[in-house]
Amino acid sequence: MKKTIKKICFFIISLVILTLLFPGLKVFGETEITETLGARYYVEENVETNFLRSGIVHVKDKAMSSTDESGMSAGGSDSSGGTVIANQFYPQSVNVLTVPSQSGVKVVNWTLTNPLGWTLATVRELAKDFEKNNPGWKVVAAINGDFFDIKGTGALPYQTNGVTVSNGEVLRPITNNATIGFTNNGTENSLVAGKNFQVGQHQLDVFDNNGEIIASFAINSFNTEPDEGETNLYFTFPYLENGERKEQTQVVPPENSYTVISPIRGLAMSANKFYGKGKINVVGEERTLTLGQFAIVTKNAELKALLAKNVLIRIQQPVIGDYAECDNIIGGGVTLVLNGEGYNPTDFNRHPRTMVGRKADGTLVFATVDGRQVAKNMYGMLQEEMAALMLHYGCVEAY
C-alpha cells in the first residue's frame, strides 16, 4: 500500500495539481466577503473542487480582491492593467490545497538530488526525483516554496534563500526572513513559524547497515589537524572574489583520515558551513579534495573503532530550539495572519504569490495566486490582500 505525501519544493513557478477527480462546482447564494487591513476578498466562482486521497482537497476559484492602497501597477510588471484604484475589486485566479494533519500524510521540502550542489528543475522533475529516492511514497500534489539564487551568482550556485531541512537532513542551516517548519506529527501543532531558528555545532553521525544512527560526535574544527581526543572536518569550499567564483582547496593528511570521495550529497556553503553524507571510500591516504568531497580526521579512539571503508557517515548541524521537532523546514517571507487577524503588511506591490497557513485544528492550507497576466484576469496580490485570502479559507496563522 502506497503512503501519501504532500510535497513542497523551492522553485518559484506555478502550482502543479496532480490527480483531479471531480468537475467544477459553481457557487450560488450570498457572497461572503472577508476583510482585513483595508483589503477585501471574495470568491466569484468555484471552478474546480477535487477530492484527492486522505482528505486532501484542492479547489480552484475565480476570485476578486481589493485594497485601500492606490497608485501602484494593478498587474505588477504587466502594466496593461493601469494603476490600482483604492477599494476597486480586481479579478484573481486562486488555487488552494487543504491538507489535514494526520499520520500517513507528510509535507516534505524537497530539492533535486545532486551530489555536489543545487540544480534547477521543474516541479514535475522534483516530484519524480522524490518518488525515485523514497520508494513507497506517492506525491499527491506539489507547490513552489522558498526563493533561491535563480541567476546562479552565489559561491555555491542556486541555493535557497533560507533554511532547507528535508526529512531530517539539514541541507542548509542558514536563515533569511521567516522560517517555516512542519512537524508531520498528526496534531493541531502541525506548523512552526515566527520563531528563532537555531542549530548546534557541526556533528558527525555514524550509521549502521540498516541506516540507523549508532553514534554521534562533535566536530571540533575545520581543515586543520585535530588535538588529541578531537575530530575535525576537511572540505574544499567555494568563495567569491570580486564576483569571480574560486575554491579554497584542502589536502587531507594520511594519518587518522577517513575520506568520502563519492558523496550522496556534499554541500560546501562557506569556510565553516558544510553538509555531507556518504560512505567512506578511502582510509589513511593523503588526498586533495574536490568540491563536495569531505574527510574526517580524528584522534578519538572511540570514533576510530567505528570508522572503516563503506561505513555511512553524515555531517550536519542539528536543529535545536523551537524547530527541533520539525523534520521538514523551509524559508519563507513575512507573516500574513497571526492569531486569526491580518498582520503588518510590508510589500505594497502586486505579484504572483504563494502562501501557507494553518487552521485551528492543524489542517494546513497552501494557496497560490497567479499574476502579471492582466488579459487573463490574473492580477496578483499585495500582502494585505493575501492576508484576506488566507483568512477567507480559515487560517489562524499564515505566511
Where are the language model's segments positioned?
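Extended C-terminal subregions enriched in glycine
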Residues: 299-399
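N-terminal secretory signal peptides that target proteins for export/translocation
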Residues: 1-5
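Acidic, glycine-rich loop-and-beta core segments that form the ion-binding/anion-interacting portion
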Residues: 282-284, 292-298, 307
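A structural detector for beta-sheet-dominated domains
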Residues: 100, 183, 283, 297-299, ...
